[in-house]
Amino acid sequence: MIVYDDTTPEQLLERIEGADIIVTKEMPVNGDLIRKFPASVKLICEAGTGYNNLDLDAAREMGITVCNIPAYSSERVAHTAIMMILNLSSTMQVQMKMLANGNHDNFTKNLQVPHVEVNGKTLGIIGAGHIGKAVMKIAKALDMNILVYTRTPRADEDGIRYVDLETVLKNSDYVSLHCPLTPQTKHMINKETLALMKP
C-alpha cells in the first residue's frame, strides 16, 4: 500500500503504476484519465458518499469497478442539516451578535428576535438514502411533519409521507437536499422550483 497525502489529476498516472486498487477522496478523475490507467487497475474506491467526480462510463468501458462508502459521515451530515434548520428558526446568530454588542436589554426581552418552533413545521427531504433517513429520524424526534421525495416510490411510514417533488416544495417550511449529484439531479433546484416554495 502506498499512501499520498495529496495527488493532483496530473500526478495520478505516475502514482498508480502497478496498482490494483485506487482509493481517492473527491479528486476529479475524468474519462480521458481513466482510459490511460494501467491494465492492473481493477477498482476505484471513492472514500466518501459522492462519486460525481468519477467518470463511471469510462470506468465501465475499461472494466474497472467503482465503489463508494454510502454511510460515510451520514450522521454528521444529518446533524449539520438539522443544526442549520434550528439555527434558522431560533435566529441564534442574531441573538449572539446582540449579546456580544452589549445589547442586553433587547436580548433579554426578546423584542427584536422572533422565535419559530420547529415542532409542527413541515420538513421536506429530497433524497432518502443514508443521510436522508438520518435526517428523518431526527426530524421525527423534533415532532416535525415530514414530506419526502425520492426517485424510488415508497409506502408512507409512521409520520413520513412520500410525495412528488412539487408537493415537497409547495408544502414544506424547510427543505433539506440529500440526493447524489448526477446529471438527473443537477439543477433540480432552480429558479422555477424555488418559486414553488412558500415565501
Model-inferred region functions:
Residues 31-34, 54-56, 78, 135, ...:
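Short glycine-/acidic-enriched loop or helix-start segments at secondary-structure transitions
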Residues 1-67, 170, 190:
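An N-terminal-biased, well-structured beta-alpha scaffold segment characteristic
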Residues 62, 70-122, 137:
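Phosphate-binding beta-alpha-beta segment of Rossmann-like dinucleotide-binding domains, i.e.
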Residues 2-7, 24-27, 101-110, 155-162, ...:
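Short gly/ser/thr-rich secondary-structure transition/capping motifs
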Residues 65-71, 162-165:
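Short beta-strand elements at the ligand-binding edges of bilobed clamshell
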Residues 111-199:
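Rossmann-like dinucleotide/phosphate-binding beta-alpha-beta segment
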Residues 49, 71, 129-132:
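Glycine-rich NAD(P) Rossmann-fold beta1-alpha1 loop
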